[in-house]
Amino acid sequence: MLSARNSLKNISRQFPKALTRAQSTAAAPTGPVIGIDLGTTNSAVAVMEGKTPKILENSEGGRTTPSIVAFTKDGERLVGIPAKRQAVVNPSDTLFATKRLIGRRYEDPEVQRDINQVPYKIVKHGNGDAWLEARGEQYSPQQIGGFILNKMKETAEAALSKKVNSAVVTCPAYFNDAQRQATKDAGKIVGLNVLRVINEPTAAALAYGLEKKDGEVVAVFDLGGGTFDVSILDIGAGVFEVKSTNGDTHLGGEDFDIALVRYIVDAFKKESGIDLEKDKMAIQRIREAAEKAKIELSSTVSTEINLPFITADASGPKHINQKISRAQFEQLVEPLIKKTIEPCKKALKDAGLSTSDVSEVILVGGMSRMPKVVETVKSIFGKEPSKGINPDEAVAMGAAIQGGILAGEVKDVVLLDVTPLSLGIETMGGVFARLISRNTTIPAKKSQIFSTAAAGQTSVEIRVFQGERELTRDNKLIGNFTLSGIPPAPKGVPQIEVTFDIDTDGIIKVSARDKATNKDASITVAGSSGLSDAEIEKMVNDAEKFAESDKARREAIEFANRADQLCNDTENSLNEHKEKLSSESVQKVQDQIQQLREIVLKAQAGEEVSPEELKQKTEELQNEAINLFKDLYKDGGESSGSSEQPKN
C-alpha cells in the first residue's frame, strides 16, 4: 500500500500533439487511410476525396453493411447482407450485435442478460471473457469484429482499386480501456493497421463541423444499435475540443427490438397459448419483423406484422397478424428513451454549460430518427436538432477526416478528445488518489510522488482504479502490478513516482519508479473487464449523491493516517529516551497512543468514526508529547550545555 506525500506537488504535463505515442509508434500510413464506423447493427466505410469525405458502397450496392457474420453448414463464412439474408434458416450460427460483448467478461450482468436474448451461443473463454460459438468453433468478439472490418477493407479496396492497410476505427465514447484495446485488436486480427481509435460522437462532430469557421458549442446525441453517447464540443477555427462526454454502453436499437419482440411473443402466447421463446427460427423471424416495424414507425403512424406459419400445434398452423401503432411502440420503449435524459444533463454540467450555451444539437445513429427520440432531445436542449448530416454515415465520414489528418491530407484541424472517467490508485486506508480526472483532454500524462506505508517495505502493489468516488472500494479495479526491489527504509522515506499515460486512443499505461534506484514496473491496462452501463451510471450518480459523505470519510482517513504517523513518531521518541523519563509519564503517553491507534485502525478500515473524537485524542497525545519532550530537552540542555539538535 502507498501513502501520499502531501508535501510534494503533483507533476502534470501533456504530450505535444506531434509526439503522442499513438502517432510515434504507429507505422507510417502507406496508401489511403480509410475511416470505419464499426457499428453494433451496421458498419460503414469512408475515405477522403480531396477535402471531402465520401461513403463507399459495398459489393451489394449498400452504403452501410449489416454487422452480421454467419457460418453455414458448408463451411462458408458470410459477412454483411448475405449473412443477414440467411439468418432465419440459420439462427444458431448467425452472429449479430457482437460489439456489445467486446472487452466484456462472461460474468458481466449485461452478458448474462444477452445470453437469453440471442439465438446463438455465448460461452465463457478460459480467460473469463465472453466468447461466441458457431458450428462447434469458438470465436472472440474481436474476431467477429475483425471479419466485419475486413469486409469494410475489401469494400474500400474494390472502390479505390488500391490496397488498403491503414484505418481509423470508431468506438463509443464511453468504451473503457479494455473495449478500446479490443477494438484495435479486431483490426490487427485481419492485418489492418488501426492508426487511431476515435470516439463516435467526436467523429460525427468532425463530419458536421469541418467547413465551419465560427465558434460553436455542439451537442452530439448518438443513439445507435447498441450504445448511447452524448458529447459536448467546442468547434471553431479548425479546433474540435471535447468539453465532456457521458453515455451508456448497453443502450441502443437492439434493446428497442428486444422490447418489441417480447411484446409480440407475449401477445401471441396470450392469444394461442403457445410460447415461442425457445423456438429459435420463430424468434429470428419475429426479430427481423420487429426491426422492420420499428423503422417503419418512424415515418408512419401504424404498421402490421404478418408472419404466416410461425408455428403449429394439433389444431394446425399458427400465424402472427398483429397491428402496432406508433403510440403503442413509444409507450413500450419509453423507459429506454428516458435513460438518455440524465447522461445529457450530466454532460452539460461537466462541461460547465447550460442548454442556452449550445448552438446546435446533432443527431447520430439510426435510433435518433425515431420521432419520440427527436422530441426528447428537443425537450432536453430546448431547440430543434440539426438535420444537416446523415445519422447513419456521419461517424464513418468523421473517421475518414481523422484518417486524412493523420495522412497529412487534411490541414489545420486539431482534435482534442477526453477520457470519460477519473483514473487513480489506491493509497493507505483505501483512499482513491485521483491522478487524472474525468473529461481530461487526451493524450495526457500525469505523475505524482507516493511513499511506503510501513517501515522496511521492499515492494509496493499499485492498484489502478477507474471511477468517481473518494474510496477505492466504491470504484472499479481495472489493473494491478507490483514494484519490487525498494531498499528497506523507514516508513514514508522512499519516493515512488507513479505516472498515468493515456494515449490518443484512450488506452492507459501506468508505471511506478523508485527514484532512489530507478527501478520501475508498469502495466498497460488492457485485460480488464468492461464497465457495465449500470456501473458507469452508478459511479457518476453515487459520486454526486455521496459527495459530502465521501469527502468526510476521506478526510477522516487522511486525518487518521496523520494521527498514525504521530503515534509512530511519539513511540520512537519514547523508546529512544525512555530511561530519562518517569515511568508514570511514559505509561500515560503509551495509553494515549493505544487509545488513538484503536480509533485510527477503525478509520483506516472504513468504519464510521467520530472526527471530533479522533481530533481530540490526537491533540491530547500531541500536547502530552510536546510537554514531556520539552522538559526532557530543557533538562538535557541545562545539564550538558550542548547545542546539538534533537534526533529526528
From Swiss-Prot:
This is Heat shock protein SSC1, mitochondrial. Its main location: mitochondrion. It is found in: Mitochondrion matrix. Residues 1-23 form a transit peptide. It holds the Pfam family HSP70. GO terms for molecular function: ATP binding; ATP hydrolysis activity; ATP-dependent protein folding chaperone; heat shock protein binding; protein folding chaperone; unfolded protein binding. SUPFAM superfamilies: Actin-like ATPase domain, Heat shock protein 70kD (HSP70), peptide-binding domain. Keywords: ATP-binding, Chaperone, Coiled coil, Mitochondrion, Nucleotide-binding, Stress response, Transit peptide. Required for the translocation of transit peptide-containing proteins from the inner membrane into the mitochondrial matrix in an ATP-dependent manner. Constitutes the ATP-driven core of the motor and binds the precursor preprotein. Belongs to the heat shock protein 70 family. InterPro entries: ATPase_NBD (IPR043129), Chaperone_DnaK (IPR012725), Heat_shock_70_CS (IPR018181), HSP70_C_sf (IPR029048), HSP70_peptide-bd_sf (IPR029047), Hsp_70_fam (IPR013126). Residues 560-633 form a coiled coil. GO terms for cellular component: cell surface; cytoplasm; fungal biofilm matrix; mitochondrial matrix; mitochondrion; plasma membrane; yeast-form cell wall. The keyword ATP-binding applies. It comes from the Eukaryota. GO terms for biological process: chaperone cofactor-dependent protein refolding; iron-sulfur cluster assembly; protein refolding. Has antigenic properties. Elicits a specific immune response in systemic candidiasis human patients undergoing malignant hematological disorders. Signal peptide: none annotated. PROSITE patterns: HSP70_1 (PS00297), HSP70_2 (PS00329), HSP70_3 (PS01036).
